[in-house]
Amino acid sequence: MPRIALYPGSFDPVTNGHLDVVRRAVTLCDRLIVAIGVHPGKKPLFSTEERLAMVRDVFGPIAAEAGCAFDCTTYDNLTITAAQQAGATIMVRGLRDGTDLDYEMQIAGMNETMAPTVQTVFVPASVAVRPITATLVRQIAAMGGDVSAFVPPQVAALLKTKFAG
């Protein structure tokens, strides 16, 4: 039976922190599904279609190089429900610090109750990417700052275009 992992997030935008998680996640599974949460109450910087393209462009080659099948999708329900619908038995979550751990442990506990066959796997962020958040990247880019140290090159170009003029 193939090991299918779901890596959920908003990916608005994709950061080097996300990239760090994906590089390690593809070693844990046979198929990685990156799931973009779409929530009607949120107003993302990038459209759903733009985020899907970004995820495919950045993560697809990493999965291919690792010999891991790769898909990306969207969901607008509970993340654990999305994992079940995708046939995932692994939920991948990145951790930057203790605050992330406290929050993620609560969610993992609830998810385990709702779907005991889906195991949460925590991937600690590498030191170099620990301070990166998509929120901070958006703020820096919006104010004309250089985000090239925090995002893949193609994402830096998209952000520059998004905030041009």
UniProtKB/Swiss-Prot annotation:
Q: What class of enzyme is it?
A: transferase
UniProt: ATP binding residues: 10-11, 18, 94-96, 104, 129-135
Q: What is its main location?
A: cytoplasm
Molecular functions (GO terms): ATP binding; pantetheine-phosphate adenylyltransferase activity
Pathway assignment: Cofactor biosynthesis; coenzyme A biosynthesis; CoA from (R)-pantothenate: step 4/5
Q: Which reaction does it catalyse?
A: (R)-4'-phosphopantetheine + ATP + H(+) = 3'-dephospho-CoA + diphosphate
Its Gene Ontology biological processes?
coenzyme A biosynthetic process
- Which keywords belong to this entry? ATP-binding, Coenzyme A biosynthesis, Cytoplasm, Magnesium, Nucleotide-binding, Nucleotidyltransferase, Transferase
Show the InterPro entries listed in the entry: Cyt_trans-like (IPR004821), PPAT (IPR001980), Rossmann-like_a/b/a_fold (IPR014729)
Look up the record and report any one GO term of the cellular component aspect.
Answer: cytoplasm
SUPFAM superfamilies attached here? Nucleotidylyl transferase
Nucleotide-binding in keyword set:
yes
Classification via Pfam families:
CTP_transf_like
Q: Which HAMAP family does this entry report, sorted A to Z?
A: PPAT_bact
**PANTHER family, per this entry?**
PHOSPHOPANTETHEINE ADENYLYLTRANSFERASE
**Designated name of the protein:** Phosphopantetheine adenylyltransferase
Q: Which organism is it from?
A: Rhodopseudomonas palustris (strain BisA53)
Q: Which gene encodes it?
A: coaD
